[in-house]
Design a protein with these regions (language model features):
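Alpha-helical transmembrane-bundle signature of multi-pass membrane transport and export proteins
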Residues: 1-183
Length: 183
């Protein structure tokens, strides 16, 4: 079992208390991932609608995906050596700050494709740190006999998210300004 789970049992905590922690973690991640992906897809939809060029969309996709793929290679080892909670929360805060800055830039008419690409890059790199940390954190709070089930639920959450987020973003981008979606 995970270290946090074993410590909780050693301190007399109910074995079923892990369920509360897992529900909080997975619920938080579900909403965080959904919001983050809606923002990502809304930005991509906005770029397509505004530029009408495949090259701008290609660059947006590269800046929005490649950094996460590269950073996540190291993200797993960082999660093994550093505080997983910090590696989950810190990138989330950085992502939130740069997204709010982009939102304000759109609201004030200052946004540019370059700024969007920089924000996509930062958001993607943050995801490359956060995602492996979450995946490494789950075994810490789940009994080993329940790990497969919880990981399966986490996988379903991610799969549903990948279906729902683009659709929600498409509806939103056609009904409200991008700056409000980013908030």
């Amino acid at each position: 079992p995970g270290a946090a789970y074993a410590a909780a049992v050693a301190n007399g905590e109910s074995e079923r208390a892990w369920i509360r922690r897992v529900v909080l973690l997975l619920t938080g991640q579900a909403f965080s991932l959904l919001g983050s992906n809606i923002v990502q897809y809304a930005i991509w939809w906005w770029i397509v609608l505004q530029t009408k060029t495949g090259s701008a969309m290609l660059l947006a996709t590269l800046f929005g995906v490649v950094p996460q793929a590269i950073v996540s290679i190291c993200g797993g080892s960082w999660a093994d050596r550093h505080s997983r909670k910090l590696l989950i929360m810190l990138p989330d805060m950085v992502i939130a700050v740069v997204t709010v800055v982009l939102s304000l830039s759109f609201a004030m008419g200052w946004a540019s494709l370059t700024m969007i690409f920089v924000v996509l890059f930062i958001r993607s790199a943050g995801g490359g740190v956060q995602t492996p940390a979450v995946q490494s954190f789950i075994p810490d709070v789940v009994p080993s006999g329940k790990l497969l089930r919880v990981n399966s639920i986490y996988g379903v959450i991610n799969s549903v998210n990948m279906i729902v987020a683009p659709a929600v973003a498409a509806v939103l981008i056609n009904t409200v300004p991008l700056w409000s979606i980013l908030l």
